[in-house]
């Protein structure tokens, strides 16, 4: 159960990185997102069901056989989300080069892209 919770938490963190968690600064380098009203985090309504499938391969590097697992949910989530968006918009040749990708930024990229040949 602990490993499943770590995977869920890591995936939610990756989703937040890709879509929500923007840390902005003004022209004087002061943070613009200083509270959770401005710095958005994903909550249960924004999340898809997350399935976890675990395979047990104990470590031989320590006496308990334990390994870290939480990061394995975080690292691929943002890449998978951004790749999925780019794939959905492949006819427009949209390339996303920064995260998080906001709806407004995504609209800008689509509007600036070449229209698909019809």
Please place each PLM-identified region on the residue numbering.
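C-terminal catalytic domains of large/alpha subunits in multi-subunit enzymes
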Residues: 1-118
């Amino acid at each position: 159960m602990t490993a499943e919770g770590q995977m869920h938490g890591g995936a939610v963190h990756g989703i937040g990185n890709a879509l929500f968690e923007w840390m902005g600064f003004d022209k004087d380098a002061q943070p613009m997102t200083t509270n959770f009203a401005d710095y958005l985090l994903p909550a249960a309504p924004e999340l898809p069901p997350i399935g976890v499938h675990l395979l047990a391969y104990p470590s031989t590097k320590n006496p308990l056989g334990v390994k870290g697992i939480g990061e394995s949910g975080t690292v691929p989530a943002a890449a998978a989300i951004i790749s999925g968006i780019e794939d959905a918009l492949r006819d427009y040749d949209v390339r996303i080069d920064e995260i998080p990708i906001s709806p407004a930024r995504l609209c800008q990229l689509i509007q600036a892209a070449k229209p698909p040949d019809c």
